[in-house]
UniProtKB/Swiss-Prot annotation:
GO CC annotation terms, alphabetical: ribonucleoprotein complex; ribosome
Protein name stated in the entry: Large ribosomal subunit protein bL34
A Pfam family of this chain: Ribosomal_L34
Similarity comment: Belongs to the bacterial ribosomal protein bL34 family.
InterPro entries xref list: Ribosomal_bL34 (IPR000271), Ribosomal_bL34_CS (IPR020939)
Organism in which the protein naturally occurs: Chlorobium limicola (strain DSM 245 / NBRC 103803 / 6330)
Keyword field: Ribonucleoprotein, Ribosomal protein
HAMAP family assigned: Ribosomal_bL34 (MF_00391)
Molecular function in Gene Ontology: structural constituent of ribosome
Name of the gene encoding the protein in the UniProt record: rpmH
One annotated GO biological process: translation
Amino acid sequence: MKRTFQPSNRKRRNKHGFRLRMSTKNGRRVLASRRAKGRHRLTVSCEMGTATK
């Protein structure tokens, strides 16, 4: 039987990335709360080296 987690960077960025967070009101609220907490990584697409991809 196939496992449930089949990692894909493209799907990861599209589902949890910065653009998706900015596209909805609740997503912007998530970013605001992560900024307020002082997170260095706001979203999965803001990781080191992947910001331009």
